Amino acid sequence: KKGKAVQLRGISSHGINWDVGEPFVNEKALQNLRDEWGVNCFRVAMYTEDYNGYCVTDTASRKKLLAKIDTAVKAGRKLGMYVIIDWHILSDGNPKKNQSKAKAFFKKMSNKYRKEKHVFYEICNEPNGGVQWKTIKSYAKSVIKGIRKADKNAVVIVGTPTWSQDVDMAAKSP
């Protein structure tokens, strides 16, 4: 931040797709997390397929998900907090399954939030089901290309195989 290292201290929503998450994605909730728990980063976990996920839901529900993301981004800006927009895969396991939707989603998000330096993009959380790093890496290059067109300095987080446990694979072949 302004040339200085930042230590992120954060918490993740459990999935903005669930109605039970509604009370927790708003300015008051984020302010409480910041003031009472010392949180400076909020991860907006949006499932892609599970729980009426972004890739499988109807247009009206998709608009609600985008509105929740926007609420978190605006609250984060006002409160001086970082916000991670998380493409949360679970049963889909392999991020390539919804690659075209991910590319369109992150193109939209990175264009909308390109001036919001407190916004980070997590383009595939916890790949699983035996997907290999080379597959994730190929997916990541494709999605990141679109993000970089909007914001060449955006922070992008890429999950690794086995629910993001195999970080050594990414370290060996970034």
Please identify what each model-predicted range represents.
Residues 1-43, 56-59:
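N-terminal carbohydrate-binding accessory modules
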Residues 1, 5-7, 93, 121, ...:
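Intrinsic structural disorder
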Residues 15, 22, 82, 99-120, ...:
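Extracellular glycoside hydrolase catalytic/binding regions
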Residues 30-113, 117-119, 123-129:
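Substrate-binding cleft and catalytic face of glycoside hydrolase catalytic domains
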